[in-house]
UniProtKB/Swiss-Prot annotation:
GO terms for molecular function: oxidoreductase activity. Gene3D superfamilies: NAD(P)-binding Rossmann-like Domain (3.40.50.720), UDP-galactose 4-epimerase, domain 1 (3.90.25.10). This is D-erythronate dehydrogenase. It comes from Haemophilus influenzae (strain ATCC 51907 / DSM 11121 / KW20 / Rd). The gene is denD. Belongs to the NAD(P)-dependent epimerase/dehydratase family. The keyword NAD applies. Keywords: Carbohydrate metabolism, NAD, NADP, Oxidoreductase. NAD(+) binds at S119, Y143, K147. Its EC number is 1.1.1.410. Pfam families: Epimerase. Catalyzes oxidation of D-erythronate to 2-oxo-tetronate. Can use either NAD(+) or NADP(+) as cosubstrate, with a preference for NAD(+).
Length: 315
């Protein structure tokens, strides 16, 4: 298979690339990684080609997406708080760049599997207790609006046969390795990751805030499953809420002490930030997993296992 990953130097792009290259049931002949900084090929694998490219002005992209391209994972984006602070950059990066790629697919290879990483931020406002696949999106942030626009565009391009698109809405990913970023949800990983490394972290939200989470490894496994799904009927809705589980910040901290003891909480300071709390609180905290599980997507069993997974794979 020939596969393209945008956002290829990001945390998810790198983990997805490494996992794809190690797969036995997906044979990768050519893996192209694209980002605004030149990505690094995992393990210097000779099957990987890396390109520095700004997808707002994608000169040369039509030479990388060809008739031989089997799939594109479009992960590149600027994150929620950054898009809120700089909406013009957000619309150019998160929406117009997506349309640029879709137009190249339409011209060069309308049969390509186009997998788009969407977000819980497409929801907001007064939500039902449990989100269904039929729940309308009502974003309350610029980032969420941009993701919702992309979802509609990809579904329309899929309906018209311009691409073979699948939109996967990601739960909040926890625990991410590395450093905090500008995402409103960055604290979700930070309040676990930093204390596990013996460092201090700030929790800017209420302990009662409920979140919808998935581990990095499960999200990557679900990306690869989306690659292998049969094409959906042209007139069906090509958006899937990836499975997750519901947990409060308080429960997360309790599970952390179960794994590492009460003393680890000394590394966590509570400094309430109304802006961050309001953004994250507007996202759904419970989603009906029925359809996604029926399609074969995976879900984590509990949060303690997520902590153990981070300790095993990322420390």
């Amino acid at each position: 298979m020939k596969v393209v990953i945008t956002g290829g130097q990001g945390f998810l792009g790198q983990r997805l690339a490494k996992t794809l290259l190690a797969q036995n049931n997906v044979h990768i002949d050519d893996l192209i990684l694209i980002d605004v900084v030149k990505p690094i090929a995992p393990n210097n694998d000779p099957r990987v080609r890396c390109y520095e490219m700004n997808l707002r002005y994608p000169t040369g992209l039509d030479e990388l997406i060809t008739e031989e391209t089997d799939a594109i994972f479009h992960l590149a984006a600027i994150v929620s708080s950054h898009a809120e602070q700089d909406p013009d950059l957000g619309y150019e990066t998160n929406f117009l760049a997506t349309r640029n790629i879709l137009e190249i697919c339409r011209k060069n290879n309308p049969k390509v599997r186009f997998i788009f990483s969407s977000s819980l931020a497409i929801f907001g406002g007064e939500l039902p207790e449990t989100i269904l696949d039929s729940t309308a999106f009502t974003p309350q942030s610029t980032y969420g609006t941009q993701k919702a626009m992309c979802e509609l565009l990809i579904n329309d391009y899929s309906r018209k046969g311009f691409v073979d698109g699948i939109v996967v809405r990601l739960p909040t990913i926890c625990i991410r390795p590395g450093k905090p970023n500008k995402a409103a949800s960055s604290f979700v990983s930070s309040i676990m990751r930093e204390p596990l490394h013996g460092e201090d972290a700030v929790c800017p939200v209420s302990e009662e805030l409920r979140l919808w989470l998935s581990s990095p490894n499960t999200v990557v496994a679900n990306f690869i499953h989306a690659l292998q799904l049969p094409s959906l009927p042209l007139r069906s809705w090509h958006t899937i809420n990836l499975p997750g589980f519901s947990v409060t910040v308080k429960q997360m901290l309790s599970d952390l002490t179960q794994v590492k003891g009460e003393a680890i909480l000394e590394h966590i300071k509570f400094e309430f930030d109304e802006s961050i709390n309001n953004i994250v609180a507007s996202w759904p905290s419970r989603i009906d997993n029925t359809q996604a599980l029926a399609l074969g997507f995976k879900v984590d069993s509990n949060f303690q296992n997520v902590i153990q997974q981070f300790i095993e794979y990322d420390m």
